[in-house]
Regions:
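N-terminal hydrophobic/helix-forming segments and targeting peptides
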Residues: 1-205
């Protein structure tokens, strides 16, 4: 497998509904080796190689779980909602990246009320995501807005891609960036004039 391509795909931000970065990487990879690339109205693409024989499609979804900004408070903290399936306790203290409407990436971290400010009962209960916030180092709502962050901006989790041992990789969104990388590699390497091979990058799994 092309580990360099897989790393590029995993490190891209592509929360469901905002798959542009992954799509651009795949299109740039596939354009030299396919006959045609078409798009649908939602942002999925279909790359075709060949034009006769049985049709074979390999599909990988480009999106990942993430968050969306729902509110900016007067102290400069971002409130958010989840996109996709999340276990609340895995979110706290996670580093994230906010992608603004202009494509600027702003780092942040998911926080909550400090433990010493919680009651004993609260300390025994898991936090829900609506008790958390994202801190981007701003001191006010005005400072957040000056940086270009708006309600509706997408937020992706941050995780470093790494190779462990001889045959393991770790990173975010491996489901299904591995599928996308395999799809691209098949289109690059399979040369069978007896089939029509399609590679599909789908959105909003």
């Amino acid at each position: 497998m092309n580990i360099e391509l897989l790393q590029q795909l995993c490190e891209a931000s592509a929360v469901s509904g905002d798959e542009q970065e992954v799509r651009d990487i795949l299109i740039n990879t596939l354009e030299p080796c396919v006959n045609e690339i078409t798009f649908d109205g939602l942002g999925s693409f279909v790359a075709r190689k060949g034009n006769k024989g049985p049709k074979v499609a390999v599909v990988g979804h480009m999106d990942e779980v993430g968050f969306m900004v729902t509110h900016i408070d007067e102290s400069g903290f971002l409130r958010f909602t989840t996109i996709g399936g999340w276990w609340n306790q895995s979110m706290l203290n996670h580093r994230v990246t906010i992608r603004t409407h202009k494509g600027v990436k702003i780092p942040g971290v998911i926080g909550s009320v400090a433990p010493h400010a919680l009651t004993e009962k609260q300390k025994q209960q898991p936090l829900s995501f609506d008790e958390m916030f994202i801190d981007i180092g701003a001191n006010s709502r005005e400072e957040v807005e000056k940086r270009g962050v708006e309600i509706g901006d997408f937020i992706s989790p941050e995780a470093n891609f790494a190779c462990w041992g001889e045959d393991k990789v770790v990173g975010k969104a491996l489901d299904n960036r591995i599928g996308c990388a395999m799809m691209a590699e098949l289109l690059q390497t399979v040369n069978n004039p007896e089939i029509t091979l399609y590679g599909v990058g789908s959105v909003e799994e």
